[in-house]
Amino acid sequence: MKITRMHGAGGKVMQELIKDVILKNLEITSVNGGIGLESLDDSATIPIGDKEIVFTVDGHTVKPIFFPGGDIGRLAVSGTVNDLAVMGAKPLALSLSLIIPEGFNLEDLEKIVKSINETSKEAEVAIITGDTKVSDGVDDIIISTAGIGIVDRGKAIRDCNVQEGDAIIVSGNIGEHGLAILLSREGFDFETNIKSDVAPINKLIERVLEEGIQINAMKDPTRGGLADALNEMAEKSNIGITIFEDKIPISDEVQSICDILGLDPLTIANEGKVVMAVKKEDAERCLEILREHPLGKNAEIIGYATKEHKGVIIETIVGRRIVDMPIGDPIPRVC
């Protein structure tokens, strides 16, 4: 069997690759009883004293490298910061590894590095180490970022802890990142204002936690979109999730173009959103806090967790249907 791009596009195919090839061949996958690789959460943890170091890594290859709303540099910082933030951690520092193709435009490289700098300042996260390689074996720049954060011991927020009755909240309009990439890459003749939502969301999440909101589970709906994130949360938590079609925040533009192209916005990648499972009693206050922040102005309560069924069910005007985990992200090379 040959590896295809689908194996790195989120969804069922990537999950199978990770479990059947990678996990089964690695034996030491956690430290000091912390959250390890086998959990397949957004980050791992290393307990030290009364704290836990939260650690994650992300590789980024996107085509085009500059797109409406962002670029590969902003994407690299945001993706890693967000993986730390959805664990309830305070992001502290990043590493930066660049694999640059021979012949790459120097002005483009400087533009990317400046974007990395601006995004790290926005997130208030330092870039403290790195590595640079120039290669004739790649066709475009690849950026890998590792990140560390900190959280009180035992307070990391897992994606496997959704509780019955929890409100399911998404922090804003979905589908924008993947669609912005697709339209920019393929040159569709659409007049559109769609831009990627790529942004660090650590300050948004921090605000919710500071207010004492009980978040039982969190995930950022990147590759595979909202459908992938909700299915992972439901499966790992051994619970069902019901969502309501008319509550899911989607801009008219995104919905219209998805309809034209035959795409499901639930499966399209986001890079500046968070999905939260929040204690029912805290849900309305959580929504208020999110909407006070520019990155959460379109936040909505989209459903609830239930033991009445497994998996993810969506209620529509014509009835109920199952929301499956996608086979893979319908738009390759988005992150």
UniProtKB/Swiss-Prot annotation:
GO biological-process terms attached to the record: protein maturation
Pfam families found in the cross-reference section: AIRS, AIRS_C
Transmembrane regions listed in the UniProt entry: none
Family that this chain belongs to: Belongs to the HypE family.
Stated name of the protein: Putative hydrogenase expression/formation protein MJ0676
The species this protein was found in: Methanocaldococcus jannaschii (strain ATCC 43067 / DSM 2661 / JAL-1 / JCM 10045 / NBRC 100440) (Methanococcus jannaschii)
